[in-house]
């Protein structure tokens, strides 16, 4: 099947859109402390608390608006949602560059979270235009654009941040605006009117996907382990900038470069090491090794006082990236084929929850143990120490699941034949169809054909 030039251009647009969204998230990390302090004249620790609230607002908007925008795109099409979200992102970057008060920073983060929630629509667009046999490859390109954006974003933010904390946002605004113009001319609608369905608030509920697996203990427990691991992992983007400024006196450029190096090594571990580890060590061992590396890295970063030691533990932590894909693979292998979409929705909802909880918890810990008069000790690394304990809890939960549900040391594909659900004696291994709730109209996940309205 030959790919038309138009199809190539639309795919390029989608990849640029995902890339710019993540670049916008990464840009703010190195310059956020300086921008907050410029507006508030607060100390680094107080700026960290404010930064936590800003990230909390952003993550909350993404969590609640992702399913809403996804369902709106099912009703009105992908093109308008994507183009409007890019217009909103461009406006957000201009607001962040201009913001005369802290209130306007919050306005910008709210707008960014809402518009960034449309990235799920970008994935849906790729699914619309791609044959089933090529979807994994195309989704891999989206993942690559995501990873590249997180690497490039902190570098741009750090380097341009040397000219002032607002400088990176002007570049981001210009790039987003240029992509709007590009998309206006090259992006056709991918969802025909006959494949659309009515907007439904039940489908737009972000908690629905998690609740759907309450009767599948093995998946619920593994989701719990993944939730804890992801919660700990949020410490890096939320506290690393404030921690390195306070403890080592780093500037925006050093913060940006360190996050970029971490992102590169983390991506390498996920792209190259996961397959090797699961093939020769098994999935269970791979998860345990990855969690162990994460726990050691977090505890080490919290205790170390030299830059050499900091870089050493940062490198160790980057290789913990093998844990999440292996754990996600175990989750997928313990769900039925027609539950994979629901499962990934639950995983995304879980990750979004960690992005809401972690900013407040981590920055409050950092502030308390750095300059609060009631602190028992001065310990700027407290959030990383807490993250190490959380990873240890995730490991304990995973080991419990491995023993309880017999998650043996096997590569992913060897377990696909036996989804593990509790079954009454004499019943099939697969769970009944009623486990995953249907839409209110009883159509499940099937699209409703557009037709003239009729009344009974």
Protein language model regions, located:
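Conserved MFS/SLC helix-loop-helix module at the cytosolic interface between two early adjacent transmembrane helices
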Residues: 63-102
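Helix-to-loop junctions at the C-terminal end of transmembrane segments
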Residues: 64-77, 269-283
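C-terminal transmembrane helical hairpin of 12-TM major facilitator-type secondary transporters
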Residues: 284-327
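Multi-pass alpha-helical transporter architecture, strongest
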Residues: 180-186, 385-423
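Cytoplasmic helix-loop-helix junction between adjacent transmembrane helices
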Residues: 108-147
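Juxtamembrane intracellular "pre-TM" segments in multi-pass secondary transporters
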Residues: 2-7, 188-224, 247, 417-425, ...
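Short amphipathic helix-loop junctions that connect adjacent transmembrane helices
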Residues: 30-48, 238-255
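A membrane-interface helix-boundary motif in multi-pass transporters
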Residues: 161-174, 364-391
């Amino acid at each position: 099947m030959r790919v038309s030039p138009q199809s190539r251009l639309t795919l390029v647009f989608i990849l640029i859109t995902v890339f710019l969204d993540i670049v916008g998230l990464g840009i703010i990390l190195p310059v956020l402390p300086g921008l907050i302090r410029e507006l508030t004249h607060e100390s680094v620790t107080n700026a960290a608390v404010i930064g936590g609230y800003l990230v909390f607002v952003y993550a909350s908007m993404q969590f609640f608006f992702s399913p809403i925008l996804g369902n709106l795109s099912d009703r009105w099409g992908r093109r308008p949602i994507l183009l409007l979200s890019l217009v909103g992102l461009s406006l957000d970057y201009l607001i962040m560059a201009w913001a005369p008060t802290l209130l306007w920073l919050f306005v910008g983060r709210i707008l960014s979270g809402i518009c960034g929630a449309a990235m799920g629509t970008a994935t849906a667009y790729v699914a619309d235009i791609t044959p089933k046999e090529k979807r994994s490859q195309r989704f891999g390109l989206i993942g690559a654009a995501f990873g590249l954006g997180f690497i490039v974003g902190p570098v741009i933010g750090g380097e341009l941040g040397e000219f002032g904390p607002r400088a990176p946002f002007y570049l981001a605004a210009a790039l987003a605006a240029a992509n709007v113009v590009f998309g206006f001319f090259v992006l056709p609608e991918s969802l025909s009117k006959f494949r659309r369905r009515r907007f439904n608030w039940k489908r737009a509920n972000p908690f629905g996907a998690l609740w759907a697996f309450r009767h599948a203990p093995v998946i619920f427990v593994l989701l719990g382990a993944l939730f804890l691991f992801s919660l700990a992992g949020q410490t890096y983007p939320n506290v690393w900038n404030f921690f390195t400024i306070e403890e080592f006196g780093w500037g925006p450029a050093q913060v940006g470069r360190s996050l970029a190096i971490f992102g590169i090594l983390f991506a390498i571990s996920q792209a190259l090491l996961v397959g090797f580890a699961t093939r020769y060590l098994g999935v269970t061992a791979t998860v345990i090794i990855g969690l162990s590396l994460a726990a050691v890295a977090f505890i080490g970063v919290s205790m170390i006082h030299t830059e050499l030691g900091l870089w050493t533990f940062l490198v160790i932590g980057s290789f913990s990236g093998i844990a999440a894909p292996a754990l996600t693979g175990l989750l997928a292998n313990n769900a039925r084929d027609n539950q994979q979409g629901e499962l990934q929705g639950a995983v995304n909802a879980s990750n979004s929850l960690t992005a809401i909880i972690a900013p407040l918890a981590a920055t409050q810990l950092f502030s308390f143990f750095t300059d609060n008069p009631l602190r028992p000790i001065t310990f700027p690394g407290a959030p990383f120490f807490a993250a190490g304990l959380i990873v240890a809890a995730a490991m304990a939960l995973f080991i419990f699941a491995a023993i309880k549900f017999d998650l043996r040391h096997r590569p992913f594909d060897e377990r696909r034949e036996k989804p593990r659900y509790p079954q009454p004696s004499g019943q099939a291994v697969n769970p009944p169809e009623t486990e995953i709730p249907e839409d209110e109209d009883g159509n499940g996940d099937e699209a409703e054909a557009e037709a003239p309205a009729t009344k009974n």
